């Protein structure tokens, strides 16, 4: 609960855990929990998250930390790599590549003998920008072609037809990019919680 409050600054861990249970009880599937490991804060909880995946039969996805919300990108931002997460989990569990085919960024693993899964979203140690087909919709209505985009298109008030045209245009723009990794060319003053999937 202490780390939860340090990271989120709002809400209660117990409420989140009840929400996860409610989603499972309602038959929503798959239930996926995203977590960003922050060195010195919650990086000792990797196995706790793996245990959660096993105990609840859900997917826990580890996302490498990216510079957001005013992080100073002129300094190296520490993160926990995909390799470290795998090494730690394999101390307790056997992981089997899940072989799921999707347009998502995660590398998925089944925890052998359980319904639990682990996903790795390794934007820093194994960039996947050249494979990304996702757009992002911010909480204030801007459609972004990329997670690290500084500018987007305001779609609030547009008709469905206009939004469809904007989406098609952004996908054409993405297809023409020769982008190997996120640039994070300027410090984000936007919280990741305000950027949708």
Identify the function of each model-found stretch.
Residues 47-55, 65-197:
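Auxiliary Fe-S-binding modules of radical SAM enzymes
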Residues 1-63:
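Radical SAM/AdoMet-radical enzyme domain recognition
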């Amino acid at each position: 609960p202490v780390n939860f409050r340090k990271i989120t600054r709002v809400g209660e861990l117990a409420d989140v855990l009840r929400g996860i249970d409610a989603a499972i009880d309602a038959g929503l599937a798959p239930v996926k929990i995203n977590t960003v490991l922050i060195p010195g804060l919650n990086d000792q909880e990797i196995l706790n998250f793996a245990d959660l995946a096993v105990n609840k039969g859900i997917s826990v996805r580890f996302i490498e930390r990216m510079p957001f919300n005013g992080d100073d990108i002129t300094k190296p931002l520490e993160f926990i790599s995909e390799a470290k997460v795998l090494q730690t989990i394999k101390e307790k569990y056997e992981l089997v590549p899940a072989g799921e085919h999707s347009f998502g960024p995660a590398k998925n693993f089944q925890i052998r003998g359980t319904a639990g899964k682990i996903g790795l979203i390794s934007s820093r140690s194994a960039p996947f920008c050249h494979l990304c087909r996702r757009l992002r919709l911010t909480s204030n209505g801007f459609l972004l072609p990329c997670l690290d985009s500084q500018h987007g298109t305001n779609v609030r008030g547009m008709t469905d037809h206009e939004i469809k045209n904007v989406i098609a245009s952004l996908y054409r723009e993405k297809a023409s990019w020769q982008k190997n990794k996120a640039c994070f060319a300027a410090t984000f003053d936007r919280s990741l919680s305000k950027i949708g999937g």
